Amino acid sequence: MTAPLPGMEEIEDPAVVREEMISAFEDASKDLASNTSYYDAERRPEAIGVTVPREMQQLLAHVGYPRLYVDSVAERQAVEGFRLGDADEADEELWQWWQANNLDIEAPLGYTDAYVHGRSFITISKPDPQLDLGWDQNVPIIRVEPPTRMHAEIDPRINRVSKAIRVAYDKEGNEIQAATLYTPMETIGWFRADGEWAEWFNVPHGLGVVPVVPLPNRTRLSDLYGTSEITPELRSMTDAAARILMLMQATAELMGVPQRLIFGIKPEEIGVDSETGQTLFDAYLARILAFEDAEGKIQQFSAAELANFTNALDQIAKQVAAYTGLPPQYLSTAADNPASAEAIRAAESRLIKKVERKNLMFGGAWEEAMRIAYRIMKGGDVPPDMLRMETVWRDPSTPTYAAKADAATKLYGNGQGVIPRERARIDMGYSVKEREEMRRWDEEEAAMGLGLLGTMVDADPTVPGSPSPTAPPKPQPAIESSGGDA
């Protein structure tokens, strides 16, 4: 008897596997609440210690370092297309699939979940005319799922998902009311009816691979499931900043205004009820205290200095910048003088390099997802050029429009530089459609004789029906006759 290949083991009882995967999902979800609390800057009383009085705990501040860091990375990631093999432009069909699934909105949210929890997931399925009403049957359904709703097991022998489960909770978020099991050969769905599981659908896709692709925030080769970007050192700095802000507020409440000592007067003269001791007006904050007793004296303590707290917060912000690579101006620790454009780019270099590395990891996941989507919709194996697919990302740096234009102009050099006109337009960030329109305008100008022959009006394979005009023949020198006319 031949043993099954790794990742292709037969599932005898899907219901048993469903229960095992739901249990694994619940175990993997235990630590997600802590990640969420840091990202959402929720109150965490355990972060301020047991010696702090209960009344003082109300002053605990919400510190948003984790959200600032995660959002600063995720907001710089934007997919612009998928290029196949040696193609010059992005593939139009794959981009239509991307747009039809609203992935320009959903994908960045998936990146945020991957940074907060260490992972998120991409699911691919073929539309069902009975279930997916109103959906284009020629477009695959591609969804991004958070780890709070999905779990996948990765087989280390093949470094690929062996099975996955997606769950849906009830309105209260207490009980799972639906589950979908993804296997290499079929996708099975269940829902709860009267407390019992009932089969919802069964799709035998026969792909040989699980139609689930993880988006792991990996930091090492051995890290198959991903690691949260909210690292222990970032958590400790967040808690320290919350404690310092709490102490600063308490100090401002108690000693921020100078304390006064008054001698030789009756309490009634400054508005204190002799029976209850209740202050009738706020003598603590009053600027002028007047009383009739000539023997009365008043003295004042110095107000508490809060500079030590602000200095401590500045040091914590510098530690956060060192751990995360965030530019100082993101943490409000920059100098009063505005930085130059070169200084800003230099400060962002670590952040940009981090985003570029994340783009490579997530780009590989999207390429695998698109290959699975192609197999689901077209059948058979993927063509060779799809094996060399490349995800096209927007430039994660932040050059100004004028700086990009200046660089592109100098590199193009009016046709004499190191890059052609089309490369300059790509560097400027124009989309595929915009560049096609520009090429058509170039052709129109060439037809009117505006001097662009031989540059952009040559045959362009990326523009269907592009004309191939030829330059007018050069004038030939006149041929002198050897003899005179009779």
UniProtKB/Swiss-Prot annotation:
Name recorded for this polypeptide: Portal protein
Region described as Disordered: 456-486
Function of the protein: Forms the portal vertex of the capsid. This portal plays critical roles in head assembly, genome packaging, neck/tail attachment, and genome ejection. The portal protein multimerizes as a single ring-shaped homododecamer arranged around a central channel. Binds to the terminase subunits to form the packaging machine.
Subunit details: Homododecamer.
Cellular component annotations (GO), alphabetically ordered: viral capsid
Pro residues: bias regions: 464-476
Chief site of localization: virion
Keywords, alphabetical: Capsid protein, Viral capsid assembly, Viral genome ejection through host cell envelope, Viral genome packaging, Viral long flexible tail ejection system, Viral penetration into host cytoplasm, Viral release from host cell, Virion, Virus entry into host cell
A single GO BP: symbiont genome ejection through host cell envelope, long flexible tail mechanism
Record family assignment: Belongs to the SPP1-like portal protein family.
Superkingdom of this protein's organism: Viruses
Localization (cell): Virion
Pfam families per UniProt: SPP1_portal
InterPro entries, per database record: Portal_protein_SPP1_Gp6-like
Species classification: Viruses, Duplodnaviria, Heunggongvirae, Uroviricota, Caudoviricetes
